[in-house]
Amino acid sequence: VTFIAVKGINKIAKITAVGGIAVMGLNLVLLLVSGAILLLNGGHFAQPLNFTLSPNPGYQSGMAMLSFVVFAIFAYGGIEAVGGLVDKTDKPEKNFAKGIIIAAIVISIGYSLAIVLWGVSANWQQVLGARSTNLGNITYVLMTSLGATLGQALHLTPAASALTGVWFARITGLSMFLAYTGAFFTLSYSPLKAIIQGTPKALWPSVMTRLNVNGMPAAAMWLQCLLVGVFIVLVSFGGDSASAFYNKLTLMANVSM
């Protein structure tokens, strides 16, 4: 990621655009398929709607519910990240502010709608309550359930329904790869630019503020790459299970945003 990112903002923009399209595609699939399942099942939800009580045992108290705020804020994390690219925007004094407002509205509606739509195909106790489900694979578990539920709603055979779920998971894997790749390219440059180039140069060693021929702080980006690699290695060999490892990585990403 760093090797390509140091070659300039144009490289980052092209890859990020592909990632954005992948995310939009996944959300569109969720919307259309959930709507189809809801119609085929006569408006029946796999997880009954309850706006006051969470099916997750970990969110039964008011204090526990407050911990969800971290994830709610993370939904807007990308907006903060692209703030470092405001100078790359055409007519930023007008277009950037407008883009932030539109993005915030879309995220708010989309985030809330997606939570409700997952209840169409996934029941907490049957799908998400398993010990094997964690923050690292939950998207694939949900999409597999979405595909399998669609097959059942279409009265396909159990084998065909399961195969539909498998293909949904495979397509999700490709889409998530593209989405995360785009996010990593943006996050490898934008926050670093805001920290280093947004503060007095006297605070940093000259090598950290030096730009390469593409206008990128290459030395700082490579140092960042090294530090991230070290932290990942330290966490991965901490002795916890893979599930706990994925949970830690996700929580680290949320806090960092």
List PLM regions with ranges.
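Transmembrane-helix boundary/entry motifs in multi-pass membrane transporters
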Residues: 1, 22, 153-173, 201, ...
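Structural signal for the C-terminal ends of transmembrane alpha-helices
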Residues: 4-9, 86-87
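Hydrophobic core segments of alpha-helical transmembrane domains in multi-pass membrane transport
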Residues: 2-5, 24-35, 224-234, 257
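Helix-loop-helix junctions that connect adjacent transmembrane segments
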Residues: 17-164, 169-170
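Transmembrane helix-loop boundary segments of multi-pass membrane transporters
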Residues: 1, 10-20, 171, 180, ...
